[in-house]
Swiss-Prot record:
Compartments where located: Cytoplasm
NCBIfam families documented for this protein: uvrC
Transmembrane parts of this sequence: none
Alphabetical GO biological process terms: nucleotide-excision repair; SOS response
Record-annotated UVR domain positions: 203-238
Protein name according to UniProt: UvrABC system protein C
Transport as UniProt keyword: no
Protein family per UniProt: Belongs to the UvrC family.
GO cellular component: cytoplasm; excinuclease repair complex
Main location: cytoplasm
PROSITE patterns tied to this protein: GIY_YIG, UVR, UVRC
Keywords: Cytoplasm, DNA damage, DNA excision, DNA repair, Excision nuclease, SOS response
Length: 600
């Protein structure tokens, strides 16, 4: 596609709000943006004389992006607010090359109390609880369960959600049996108020726990004392040491960004009743370190942290600095939560001090990250294999089966120098050959890009054929993901797997690479492949055991192994065999065998 074609596309832009997308010569998505007026916004990227080129008045990052752009697409929306929400969704799902993606798809827990209950108690939730008299505390980015356990350990509140008579907790003085009316509502409320005060003031809770730990140790109950010691350590880790006096007992949130040495640091303070009760920080390596866009980051950060299904306790959000779409975000959040939400930049006073503190901590977190993690290998991979992204988030895929039995796939995740086991995935597969199995696994993962953002790199256990397959799937999604594959060298058209002699080759879209066995890049990729292989084999073995157990049940009915395999090949799994219609079974394996299955 030529620049002439792009110039013609620019002429079709409407004077309405919407989202625009830039693509390169290979059809890869470069950038997603939103506009109040698509025609004016998109044309501001270009200069038109003597011919079409990047506007020199824009940043170097934008100029470089426009130089690569050969095609644009756009979607109109009813308003700029709708465009901003759609833009954020596209960035998360498609991971464009020149957009910065904040990888935090977690929902964090809140502790809440339902005052509609006769004797309220603390519970944990990650979503909005649709009841009228709920008080929330949080979100807590870590340690919510430990806090809750500590509260129930020290304060004799109702321990069970439903209980009709005094239980073991009453016998050990951990509950005052409100279920049996052994405590008045007024006295119970006094204890609950003390517990809520302790929740907002962890130092109070710590003092109480330390006293209890000492008593247990003196009574030689060392096991329980050790549990409390661990709770104390967790709660101490939650405490935020702030020498700023927030005079008012108010609720608000604080956000700050810092950028240094190609690292983006985001930080969030949650303030309730004038106390910082929770802190969340995140480090994101920037893949295109020419420049970064604070407006883009603040938009993502605030929209992702305040999704529609969570409680928003504060009505004021303070940010460290001004950004372009601040007022628009105010409007979106106010509509989303049906109340007035303000996003402010404080100039003086305690709010300015706390914003400055958030920024200072964001900078410190970058320094800590760089001391703790070495990104040398990622930089070497990016340079050597000419990757578009710095591969900090890597997904590795492998399949496992035994002659078409117990077909499974596995995905493991390596994120910023460590395994992220919370994102490991297992797949039961329908297909029997390696190619179709990998297609099934990769397609299922790609379909989840809108829920779990794509990584920087896919590593496939296989050769060029599977590499091309992965490329086809990624191109179909429009996502910006680099791809590598690792396979054993072939001798006489067969993979050479002799112990001690097996040599791996790396396949990229740029070609095939044979690296020295001592090469750190090869060893790193082998480590990733081996973990995926281990995970896939383990899942295959467990699946095979379960299938063997179920197969033995059918064998006990007098069905031959051939009949069982025929049934599995047709129905895919044992559950479908048992649920199958008698007529269908009879047509496949005969009436006698079908009758045995249905009768048992």
């Amino acid at each position: 596609m030529t620049k002439e074609k792009l110039e013609n596309e620019l002429k079709t832009l409407p004077n309405s709000a919407g989202v625009y997308e830039y693509f390169n010569q290979e059809g890869k998505l470069l950038y997603v943006g939103k506009a109040k007026n698509l025609k004016n916004r998109v044309k501001s990227y270009f200069a038109f004389t003597p011919n079409l080129h990047a506007n020199p008045g824009n940043s170097l990052r934008i100029q470089k992006m426009i130089q690569e752009t050969v095609h644009l697409e756009f979607i109109t929306t009813n308003s700029e607010a709708d465009a901003l929400i759609l833009e954020n969704s596209f960035i998360k799902q498609l991971h464009p090359k020149y957009n910065i993606l904040l990888r935090d798809d977690k929902t964090y827990p809140y502790i809440y109390v339902d005052f509609k209950e006769e004797f309220p108690r603390f519970e944990i939730t990650r979503k909005l609880v649709k009841k009228s008299k709920i008080k929330y505390f949080g979100p807590f980015f870590k340690g919510a369960r430990e806090l809750l356990d500590a509260l129930y350990l020290y304060y004799p509140l109702k321990q069970k959600a439903s209980c009709k008579s005094p239980c073991i907790f009453y016998q050990i003085s951990r509950c005052l049996a409100p279920c049996d009316k052994r405590i008045s509502k007024e006295k119970y409320r006094e204890i609950l108020d003390e517990a809520m005060h302790a929740l907002l003031n962890p130092s109070v809770l710590l003092k109480n726990l330390e006293k209890q730990m000492l008593v247990l140790a003196q009574n030689e109950n060392y096991e329980e004392a050790a549990k409390i010691r661990d709770q104390i350590a967790t709660i101490k880790d939650l405490e935020v040491k702030v020498e700023i006096d927030i005079a008012k007992l108010e609720d608000f949130e604080v956000f700050a960004l810092a950028f240094k040495n190609s690292m983006l640091s985001t930080l969030r303070f949650v303030v309730q009743n004038g106390k910082i009760i929770s802190v969340n920080s995140k480090i994101t390596p920037i893949k295109n370190d020419i420049q970064w866009d604070k407006n883009e980051i603040y938009k993502q950060l605030i929209l992702e942290n305040f999704s529609m299904d969570i409680p928003l306790l504060a009505s004021v959000i303070y940010v460290y600095e001004e950004f372009e779409d601040r007022m628009l975000l105010e409007k979106i959040l106010s509509q989303r939560f049906d109340k007035k939400i303000s996003i402010k930049i404080p100039k003086i006073g305690e709010k300015r001090k706390i914003c400055d503190l958030a920024f200072q901590n964001a900078l410190l977190n970058i320094e800590k990250e760089q001391k703790n993690h070495d990104f040398t290998i990622q930089k070497e991979l990016k340079s050597y294999f000419e990757l578009e992204n710095l591969p900090n988030d890597i997904e590795i895929f492998d399949n496992s089966h035994l002659q078409g039995v117990a077909n499974v796939g596995a995905m493991v995740t390596y994120s910023v120098n460590s395994w992220d086991k919370s994102k490991y995935r297992k797949f039961h597969l329908k297909h029997k050959n390696d190619y179709d199995q990998m297609r099934e696994v990769l397609t299922r993962r790609a379909l989840d890009f809108d829920k779990i953002p794509p990584p920087d790199l896919w590593l496939i256990d296989g050769g060029k054929v599977l590499l091309d397959l992965a490329k086809e799937i990624i191109l179909s999604t429009g996502a910006n993901v680099d791809i590598l594959a690792i396979s054993k060298e072939k001798i006489d058209a067969k993979a050479h797997r002799a112990k001690g002699g097996a040599k791996d080759k790396i396949h990229s879209l740029k070609g095939e690479f044979s690296l020295s066995v001592n090469d750190k890049k090869l060893q790193f990729l082998q480590k990733l492949r081996d973990e995926a292989h281990r995970f896939a084999i383990s899942f295959h073995q467990n699946t095979k055991k379960k299938q063997d157990l179920k197969s033995s049940k059918l064998a006990n009915l007098g069905l031959s192994l051939g009949v069982i395999q025929k049934l599995l090949a047709y129905y895919g799994n044992f559950e479908s065999i048992y649920k199958a219609d008698f007529k269908d079974l009879a047509m496949l394996v005969g009436k006698k065998a079908a009758q045995k299955i249905k009768e048992n």
